[in-house]
Amino acid sequence: MAAGIDDISIYIPQLYLDASDFAHARGLDPEKLERGLGIGQMAIVDTNQDPACLASNACLKVMQKNKLTPDQIGRLYVATESALDESKAMNSYVIGMLEQVYGDDTFGHCGGIECKFACVSGSYALYDNTNWIRAGEAEDKYALVVVSDIAKYDMGSSGEVTQGAGAVAMLLNDKPRLLTFDPKVTSTSIKNEYDFYRPFGKETPIVHGQYSNLLYLIQVKNALTDYKNKVKRTGLIKIKDDETILDHIDYLNMHLPYSN
């Protein structure tokens, strides 16, 4: 059975700080931000918005766009680094807000959790829900996977220029129009490091930027090597002696905190 992303909606707060204004306030070169890092504007939440609010708006957009009703949604996962509570999952807040639109208990049947693992938690949420669909448990229902964050850094820190806020809601089913995930081979790589983390009680992360960039490259290489070994073992791809795994890949979709 196929499984993947059928549609996507994005919600970004209406308030923003122009990157050139930020650069002048911090004594930075605006060209470095706009051309070097690809940053033109920094989204800012209003006083009545939080990550759950952003996620709810993204979900509402994708549901209304596809004319879906709550009974057609079987799962709702939220992936975030901006948790509101140490126990109560953010998806329950999102469901509560959606029920203000669709009615009390209209999402009472909807399973889900909050996922946390820095920037990769959304990928794991996608992985879990595509497997739920492939297993036949969805019963023709959709899964909603939402990534939502308010990224804040210490004032004057190197990470301050990459701040922002927003949410992306991905609608998953067994007949995806946008992207189908390969069910045969998945690879990952993990190591316990302290390049980017946010201890309990701290609103901003502790970041070692250059070290984090290096670790990212190492982990991507390790995951790609593991993927190559798996596809060779399963026979999914036949790699000749004068070829690399990249000769059999049309596109690479990478996570990057900045465009250059």
What are these regions (language model features)?
Residues N48, Y77-T80, F107-Y124, G156-E160, ...:
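Cysteine-centered functional microenvironments
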